[in-house]
């Protein structure tokens, strides 16, 4: 399988959303850019901010859609068209209610699982054949509390766990960029 050429962090723009659970995808690509010493640039034709990084000797584009979460597909598909990147060479990093804070999982293909950024991207692509990095944020316990939960800020303890999961995911990105997803998954999914 081809390696990654585009890594998208899903989230909501604006300072009021900056440290919310729903912006775990933004936090992931921001940490990748920081580690690489890359700078973010506004790119209106791609409806977001972009950064160019080197991972495992390969050029990889990072993208933070400036659309709100439920319109993320517009930015994702614009970037894929502009840079001529296939969906299979794309990873979308997003918050995951079904995983505990401190857990991150890689996945290829599938549905949206109620995640609106994935839903919009799948709608525009016509399929879900792209990679996902699911960053655990935990579940509030009842579906009626989900909106407030994802749009809220995590506790200090959960914030540390989420940051640790992001660091663990960054550690396996060289393997994913080289196309060795099975080894990347094995390392990320094996408890330490």
From Swiss-Prot:
Q: Where does tRNA bind?
A: 17, 68, 70, 116
Does this entry carry the keyword tRNA-binding? yes
The principal location of this protein is: cytoplasm
Q: Is-annotated flag, keyword Cytoplasm? A: yes
Sorted UniProt keywords: Cytoplasm, Hydrolase, RNA-binding, tRNA-binding
Give site residues, Discriminates between blocked and unblocked aminoacyl-tRNA.
12
Localization (cell): Cytoplasm
InterPro entries per the record? Pept_tRNA_hydro, Pept_tRNA_hydro_CS, Pept_tRNA_hydro_sf
Q: Name one GO cellular component term.
A: cytoplasm
Show the active-site residues: 22 (proton acceptor)
The annotated site for Stabilizes the basic form of H active site to accept a proton falls at 95
Q: Which PANTHER family match?
A: PEPTIDYL-TRNA HYDROLASE
Q: Which family does it belong to?
A: Belongs to the PTH family.
What does this gene product do? Hydrolyzes ribosome-free peptidyl-tRNAs (with 1 or more amino acids incorporated), which drop off the ribosome during protein synthesis, or as a result of ribosome stalling.
The molecule here is called Peptidyl-tRNA hydrolase
Q: Which organism is it from?
A: Stenotrophomonas maltophilia (strain K279a)
